[in-house]
Amino acid sequence: MAPPAKSANQRREESKRSLPTRRKSRIVPFPQKETILTHREELDAVSHSRGGKVSLSPSASQPPLEKLIGSLNLLLSEMLELEASGLIHTTQVQLSHQASARNLVDYLALRRRDIRQLQSDLASLGLSSLGRTEPHVQSSLVTVLNVLHKLAGSTATVSASTAVPQFGQGADLLEKNTNILLGDAPANRHVRIMVTMPAEAATNYELVRDLLSQGMDCMRINCAHDGPETWSAMIRNLRRAEKETNKRCKVAMDLAGPKLRTGSIEPGPAVLKYRPHRDAFGHITSPARIWLTSDSDPEVASEPADAVIPIPSPGLGRLRLRDRLHFTDARGAPRSMIIKGVKGKNRWAEAVRTAYVFEGMMLEVRRPVSKGKRAYIQRTRVGPISPRKQTLRLNLGDTLLLTRSLDPGRPSQRDSQENLITPAQISVSLPEFFDGVKAGEPIWLDDGMIGGIIRTVTPDQVRVEITQARPGGEKLGAEKGINVPESHLRLSSLTGQDLKVLPFVVKNADIVSYSFVRTEADVLDLQSHLAKLGGKKLGIILKIETREGFDHLPRLLLALMRSRAIGIMIARGDLAVECGYQRLAEVQEEILWVCEAAHVPVVWATQVLESLAKNGIPSRSEVTDAAMGERAECVMLNKGRYTVTAVRILSDILERMQPHHEKKNSLLRKLHLAVVF
């Protein structure tokens, strides 16, 4: 077993002392209440004059240093007021998280005000502008305050409470919490890599081994897919790979949660289409290749086929090379295909004209008997053809009906003049949707591809006007996501299906990822069920993927601190739809800041190196996005054909970025461009 890598702080501060034991606070008394009120009144006056933006700047009537000292004293007093409000104690935060909880509350108190002018004033004096206070908020503020006292010629000093992290201790706490949740960091990087498993990982040991050897630190299993047998096989392959590679890897299992989706759609016609291949000028470059197989015992084609047509075995067995099959297709067009190959009980046919083949279509077989002549041999019919999956075409201004009834959806119906008879309709997976939405609220479908406004709501039906769709319309399919960011749905984040799989998760996983968390009650509900199952030590990652979850993040963190191994995932897919794409960058920054203040590790997820994982080639923008993952403690990759390559490249990107960046801090290592200048 390879020795664990030294922590970032160990490498940087090996000689530093460990966390001190608690001692009596040495906080110097703050200004009298009257003085604090004076500063507060001045701040409120400035806030009113600036349209609600509070500025902590020196005024012309006061010496700048005195004003800055007063502003910092006010911020410090507000931190203590919020700490004393009982918020931390009522959430029963674990002892190991008490200092982090206080630091989080201090950070929230700091960020309740607009301190941009104060930052500018401090920077003009060559002091810290409080822009990197997250790990140790009160200590940062107190240090700046003491420097200001000295600059003002005062002998007064202020000390931070011993109940909050001092300089260096915040980073230590975050690193310790990350190690507890995700395991020790690999030797060359401190950011872990989480990888979503495809079903293939249950049967392909080499895939799991290669992922582990290339840098996977955490295996992610999505409980919305497959089942316990498949999940067990994935974990067995991982444990075997750990022994072979001498590496350790955590297992995280995602609970599916109450995902709001569209229902089924009535199937389309049982018809299939094939066509020959043509060049840019429309000339045929190769005929369509059709695989003819038995309708009762079909076999998969050994080569790519343009169409697969089932035929009854007796008729199929009598087909020979060069036989020609004549038929009238679904459009009434006369068509034919010729037998070009025999593969066991199956046949290969070729055709040079496009055709639409339907179930029960008559095939007349003719065989060459002499030059230019063919004799009738037999008639047979096309066997069962699977109906086409149907979608709903939605254009700007169209109406869509969302129904409580789970009857299959259907497209809109129009008369010969294209006048609407009945609008398109489709069911919704969760009945709570109809009790929680209101007219006038926005709705997004299919990961934000289609936007609309809810116009009317009845107990069994919601009428939506489509307000966003590309020219030519969008296709809405079955099982597509629905987001209602401004609605308040009464949903439990733990579904009945989640509770069924939770015992397996407790027994086999290291971490449970909790989907669609919205409130403190959701967190407490999961913790309660884990305790009943003997899973109190199981790591918990809350997935922030709704606007409500984001708005409640501080309280979610305090509730989460009842558990020891904890983390947050930025699920950027749903979150972008819920909060708006234009706000995603801002929202993910806020999550990173707040979690750093709470010393809680963050998983950076959704569409990281997506093009690389699926197509083998990354886009320029997603490489930059992956590099941003350096600011989190873990980066998650989704499954794809080239996931092993994606893991290797992501690991390389993170290793290269580590000397340049640590959270919000730019690290000034020796710069190549400066050396070659």
Segments predicted by a language model, with ranges:
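Intrinsically disordered, low-complexity arginine-rich tails of RNA-binding/processing proteins
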Residues: 6-14, 668
